[in-house]
């Protein structure tokens, strides 16, 4: 794999040898190293990478990052010694393919992205109201009817549908290939079959397993739907166990995600079968029916030597300590679960939802809500071990995960834009025990843009850091400077509201002054990268307070 990467990225060909030689790169397997730890030593005439199998892979990734992206035939790396191991055992990224189907080739590319930066888990969100994406051979109706929708809501405005058929699914053969591809890159794939809510695609194929009997169609817009699985229908459990049995054959992961989020109970309140089950089990509230369902599915998975994971609503289902809780509605669910002795994966909306805007919604591609903004600096500031988790329970925080929900991410190019550079920040907080300053992080991380350019990967060009200093003499003058962390990048700006790409002045590290006496002033700037790639227009308004 290392030789292939060097050939593809640098047009360098290396020969393999079983003996140590000068001017060679040696990978030495040593099981005494920590599970994913490694040692990388660069000498004048030799490079040594030591570790177990996973550690060797991560040592290789570090070595590749040390090679300048612009390097040609003569590659030079200064001598150094690195001893490294991860902070968290679970370092993940989730991709929602339920809203939009991404090709098997792109799924492999996504795995390349995360593995290159030492993430080791791909949470594959395979089913949704908007699409069923996994072939189940016993029930071909699931993909025949559930994998396709008539159109898609493409904007938050009412009635903004494209009326274009959309869909797709992964065959079991494709899934096996992807699982094997990931394993070679030290990535475990955790499949998610979301239930008992977010199941309109399934109910389109099996309306009799709902409380009303349907008919249904695969969802064309976004939001929480009232129609969910009928918990009181015994036939439901046979279908769910059949589906999971095929899923377990495809995915060797010890963890299986069953969703469990956003499950309305309105239909259960009016359903004779659900009310009968409620009475039979001695339950008092419809919400407890979800607990019955989750515990029953958990027992089935345990019988197959698998462990259940669910979104943090599952914590309310009186589940056993073996269930992993994924905290998403803020951090409170994860804090509570860890203090109870549950293993926890932290992925709160406030830090780890990478479908959220990266900057000003006015100049960014459309996102889920104008109120939802998670810039790069906020991602980097996150600490998955919240201070409200008691010290003795810190060990229950398995790790951290970034989530890519795709309601408005309709293309691979836009998905790449949402991935980078926030993936760099996620990778660092997941791996590194110590934390750098944000400026230090940017100086290191932004060097990776050369690699993305070289491999034709899209990314968001970050805005400059603006250092402002208001006048203290009552003159209402605002002075500011701008900093950027990419060698050769250029900043163009205006302070009169005009387009900086057309009319902007090139910033030369000078102090820029704004007189705010006459009302609000607008700073607009763009960044032009050495590759020629240009940022969105960054807009900041200033006024006298």
What are these regions (language model features)?
Residues 130-184, 199-238, 266-286:
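Aromatic- and acidic-residue-enriched carbohydrate-binding clefts of CAZyme catalytic domains
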Residues 1-88, 414, 430-451, 455:
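Contiguous, structured surface segment used for ligand recognition
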Residues 96-129:
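A conserved hydrophobic secondary-structure block that centers on an alpha-helix together
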Residues 52, 93, 114, 189, ...:
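Conserved, mostly hydrophobic/aromatic
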Residues 207, 219-220, 224-322, 328-336:
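Active-site neighborhood of glycoside hydrolase catalytic domains
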Residues 436-545:
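Short, compositionally stereotyped local motifs that mark structural "simplifiers"
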Residues 90-94, 121-123, 186-190, 228, ...:
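Structural preference for beta-strand elements that scaffold enzyme active sites
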